[in-house]
């Protein structure tokens, strides 16, 4: 079944047009994407490995994806985390760290602290092949140094938001 997204203009206004995944974008067209940095109760970060058949296959990232037609980013980030990992945010409210633009995508990056164990993670076939918990310091170094195991877009999108992610982590420890 085809996946459809709302089309936005360069100022993040919905145009009323729809985009089918895999089709080329027109000039100035964008869609909405989300990602979520999920910290467990010890402050470790959930990373998932991309399916080998996907772009950046075999590399690690935080869960995320594209908002479907009619979804806002908060709805999309909840759905993406649940689909890719089986984790449900329940009453937890993810904090929006900021928005970056990557290729034809506005990406809203969120962070959340969630009580879960790695054994709770259920991978989504065709999307994720593995999951692990990394220390915050390990993830921060990977972003700063451009570690070869980290999916490139994650580095590009996280680098400008790293100060906000650090602040979130510090506040979440309290």
PLM feature spans:
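Acidic, metal-coordinating catalytic segment for phosphate/diphosphate chemistry
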Residues: 1-35, 39-41
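A residue-level structural signature of the nucleotidyltransferase/glycosyltransferase Rossmann-like core
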Residues: 5, 29, 44-45, 59, ...
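Conserved hydrophobic "DFG−1" position in protein kinase catalytic cores
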Residues: 7, 38, 47, 111-112, ...
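Short loop segments at secondary-structure junctions
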Residues: 11, 40-43, 51, 113-118, ...
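A glycine-rich, hydrophobic loop/mini-helix early in the fold
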Residues: 33-64
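Helix-adjacent hinge/juxtasegments
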Residues: 56-88
């Amino acid at each position: 079944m085809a996946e459809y997204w709302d089309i936005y203009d360069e100022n993040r206004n919905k145009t009323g047009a729809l985009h089918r995944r895999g089709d080329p974008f027109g000039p100035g067209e964008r869609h909405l994407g989300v990602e979520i940095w999920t910290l467990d109760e010890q402050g470790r970060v959930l990373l998932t490995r991309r399916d080998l058949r996907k772009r950046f296959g075999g590399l690690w990232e935080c869960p995320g994806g594209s908002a479907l037609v009619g979804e806002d980013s908060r709805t999309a980030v909840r759905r993406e985390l649940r689909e890719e990992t089986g984790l449900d945010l329940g009453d937890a409210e993810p904090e929006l760290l900021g928005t970056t633009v990557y290729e034809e995508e506005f990406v809203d990056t969120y962070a959340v602290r969630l009580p879960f164990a790695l054994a709770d993670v259920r991978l989504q076939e065709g999307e994720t092949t593995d999951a692990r918990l990394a220390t915050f310091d390990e993830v921060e170094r990977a972003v700063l140094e451009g570690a070869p195991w980290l999916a490139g877009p994650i580095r590009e999108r996280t680098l400008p938001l790293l100060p906000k992610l650090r602040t979130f982590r510090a506040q979440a420890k309290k």
